[in-house]
Amino acid sequence: WTSNRFFRNFGSSTISIDIIMRRRLLSLCAVLCMALVVMAEGKAKYVFYFIGDGMGVNQVNGTETYMAAVEGRIGTSPLCFAQFPYVGLVTTYSGTNGVTDSAAGGTALATGNKTKNGALGIKSDLTTRINSIAALAKSEGKAVGVTTSVSVDHATPASFYAHVKDRNMYHQIGKDLIAAGFDFYAGSDFLQPENNELSGNKDLYTQCREAGYTIARGYADYRKKAKKADKMLLLQTETANKADRTSIPYAIDRQKNDLTLQDITRAAIHFLSQKDTDGFFLMVEGGKIDWACHSNDAATAFKEVIDMDN
């Protein structure tokens, strides 16, 4: 991944990778859908990295079977990413466990390195830092966005910018988000915006603003602020936070003015496209497929898969 080799080598391919299975049907698995939009000479300019957390083969097949049933027929109705020309399966054990978790799995997705369960952006020795594909893209002059339907400091998005030994170090992860300096972040909110022991009297919102980030609350607020913003942090509204700050609502429970993964993706593409850079890298996580499966809620899981596919 040194120099510009990464962007040249992928060329015009599209990839879908089924990854990160957990025990039984309550798997923490991710299907990686990386779509590359290329320039005439074959060098990737726009890289989209879609991760469905908890989305293994069963979740994909179950959703496609459900979609066919809704259409009144037996069989399957293919999801968009399932029709990509290249599909692969990989083993998902972490550096120290047969069953991975979101932190180790996310680090593998973001950096290509296996690590200890719970660790983010560091090797199994819990000391050696490893940089992500997002950091590489930033170092090569690309605009970078990291987005999710859960909190911005959750394990999968944090794998792309943080370097901590414990995924529960949410305040430190938030500080790493700021230090990474990516152009666009989006999710429900921070889980631990305040920690006087680490940050004095400054919460993460204050630190973000001091680092040059504009904070938008909801898609309508983003549209008002985007043009004048240098860097953007898109979060859900304060009203939505009172109900649940850990994530945006499930697709099956969505209300009219709720922030959606489509809103987040649309805003990210818009914001990154207006940056004066040679293309961009964007990671989008559908983070609640896994949560629905932990609750044994098939209907909600299928709706979350469809929502990410949209």
Where are these regions (language model features)?
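Phosphate/oxyanion-binding active-site loops and adjacent basic polyanion-contact surfaces
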Residues: D166, K256-T265, E304-M308
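Sec-dependent signal peptide recognition
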Residues: R22-V31
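Hydrophobic h-region of N-terminal signal peptides that target proteins for export
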Residues: V31-M39
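Active-site regions of oxyanion-processing enzymes, predominantly non-cytosolic
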Residues: G218, Y222-Q236, I264-G287
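Generic beta-strand/beta-sheet core signal
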Residues: F50-I51, T147, G187-S188, L235-E238, ...
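N-terminal catalytic scaffold of extracellular/periplasmic and nuclease hydrolases
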Residues: E41-A226, D230-K231, D307
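Active-site His/acidic residue clusters
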Residues: A155-Y161, T239-D253, A268, D276-N310
